[in-house]
Amino acid sequence: MGCSLLSPVHLGVGIMSNLSTALNLAPADSQLPVGVYFDEALHQQELELLFRNGPGYVGHELMVPETGDYHTLKAEDEGRMLVRNAAGVELMSNVCRHRQAIMLNGRGNKQNIVCPLHRWTYDLKGELLGAPHFDQQPCLHLKRTPLQNWNGLLFEGPRDVRADLARLGVAQDLNFDGYMLDHVEVHECDYNWKTFIEVYLEDYHVVPFHPGLGSFVSCDDLKWEFGEWHSVQTVGLHAGLKRPGSPTYQKWHDAVLRFNNGVLPKHGAIWLTYYPNIMVEWYPNVLVISTLHPVGPRKTRNVVEFYYPEEIALFEREFVEAERAAYMETCIEDDEIAERMDAGRLALLKRGTSEVGPYQSPMEDGMQHFHEWYRRAMAYAG
C-alpha cells in the first residue's frame, strides 16, 4: 500500500524521496487496458520476460539456520528445497533421481537426504551416496542452483540484486539480525498478480476500506523512495495508537504498546516492493516477506513469511498471534478490493470496451510507477 512523488521521466535515476508532487508528477497515460489482466498469451510472456528474468526470490537464510536444516519451497509444491550444509545454504532439487519422487516435506533437520521409496541417499550437497542393490552406483546427483544473498534474502534470478538495491534507503530497517522465522502462510488469490501489486502500491483505499490498518498507520506523512526496479513506502503511526479501528487491531495495538513499555515505534510500517513480485515489510518488531507466484491470469499464490526477534518468537506468543491476525484481516480486505477490480474489468472486456481512470496524486503514484515499469520491462505499448 502506498503512494509516490515521482515523475515517470525520473524512473531510472536511483532513489527519490520527499519530492514535491506539483513539481515532479506529470499527467500520465500509463494505465493498463483491461485485457492485460485476462490474456493467457500475455501471461506467458510475463512469466518469461518479468519472472524468469527477474530477481527470483526463493527464501531467506533464516529458514535453515543450522547445519542439516532443510526447508521445502511451498511455492513450488516442495519440488525444491533450501539446505544448509558446511559450505552454507544451497538451493537444490527435492526430486529423487531414481523415480522422481518428492523426498522431504516441510522443514526439519537431516544428516543425509533419503528418499523414502527406495532409500536412495544423498549428502547435504546433493551428491548421491548410495543406491541399494545397484552393482554400480549411478552418477546421479541433485541439481543445485547458485544463489545471491541480500540481507539474508536468497535469489536465483539473473538480475544483480545488490546493484538493484545498492542505494536502498531503508536497508538497515530491513535487517534480519536477531530474527527467526516463525511461520509461513500460503494465500490463494482469485485475481491477477498485477491487480495485487496495484492494490499494494496505493494508499487511496486505506482509510475508507481498512478500518483496522487505517487506524494503525497514518498515510498523512508518507515518505517515498523510488528506483528503477523498486519502490518504498514509509508511513507513520495513527493517533499514537490510541484509537484502534477493529477488535483484531485492538489486540495488535495492545501487544505493540505492551512489548515496548508504552514507547511508540518510530514508524507504522515500511513497504518495499521489488519488481515484479517481492514485498519486504517492516512493522514494529516484525519483518514479513511476501512473494507472488502467478498460477494463471486469474489466479495468484501469495507466500507470506513472518519473522520476529527471537525473544518474541520464543516467548511472546500473544504478540505473534495478534500481529498475524491483524495482517490477515487486512489481507482479506485487500482480496475484496482486488476481486472487485478484476470483476469490473472483466465486465468491460465482455462488453468489448476498456476504461481507465486517473491516478490520484500522491496516493496512487506508486501504481503509476508500477505501470511505467511494466510497460518498459514488457516493451508494452498497448
What are the language-model segments listed below?
Residues S20-V34, D177-Y179:
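Short, contiguous pre-domain boundary segments
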Residues V36-A75:
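Non-catalytic accessory segments flanking enzyme active sites
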Residues N53-G59, M63, E127-A131, W271-P276:
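Short Pro/Gly-enriched beta-strand edge/turn motifs at strand-loop
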Residues V58, M103, L128, L213, ...:
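Short clusters of hydrophobic/aromatic residues that line enzyme substrate/ligand-binding pockets
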Residues M63-R159, A166:
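Rieske [2Fe-2S] iron-sulfur-binding domain
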Residues V83, N94, P146-Q148, L153-F155, ...:
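C-terminal catalytic domain of Rieske-type non-heme iron oxygenases
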